[in-house]
Amino acid sequence: MSIVSNTGPLIALAKVNQLRLLEVLYQQVHLPPAVHRELLAKTGVEAERLDQALATFIRVADPLELTPEVQAATLSLGAGEREAVALAHHMRLLLVMDDQLGRQAAQGLDLEVTGTASVLILAKQKGLIESVRKLLELMREHGYWLSDELITTAAELAGEE
């Protein structure tokens, strides 16, 4: 199974050195060019982790011409979100995105959407990680914005206290 990802989930997982979860769970991740450009702008250890993933299981797609339907649904989004929605729509793949407006646009196009927390819940169900809460809290400590409510809900869904 392959997926399309937006920038946010990749950065969040890179922050806690868990990009491998995407490879184990989904085998291949597809990125639109705008997301690739956003990832190339990262520096430090995150950039090194992202570079390793780009060299192995992440594929950068060719630019797509947006259909009128996708254009209309994604008018208020940034380039990365817009292109990620368009690529998921074109390839008919699951979209991994945390941005709320982007998720709404994708759902309006009848796309299946998941987020970083759901990826971690699935990873825990498959025995790949021990704690969803700990990883989400670590992401937040490293500057990835996550609400208390999201962390609590995800931990509960993962069967954690």
Predicted regions and their residues:
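Active-site-proximal, substrate-binding regions of enzyme catalytic domains
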Residues: 1-93, 100, 109-111, 134, ...
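Mid-chain, well-packed structural core segment of small domains
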Residues: 97-119, 125
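Hydrophobic alpha-helical interaction segments
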Residues: 115-158
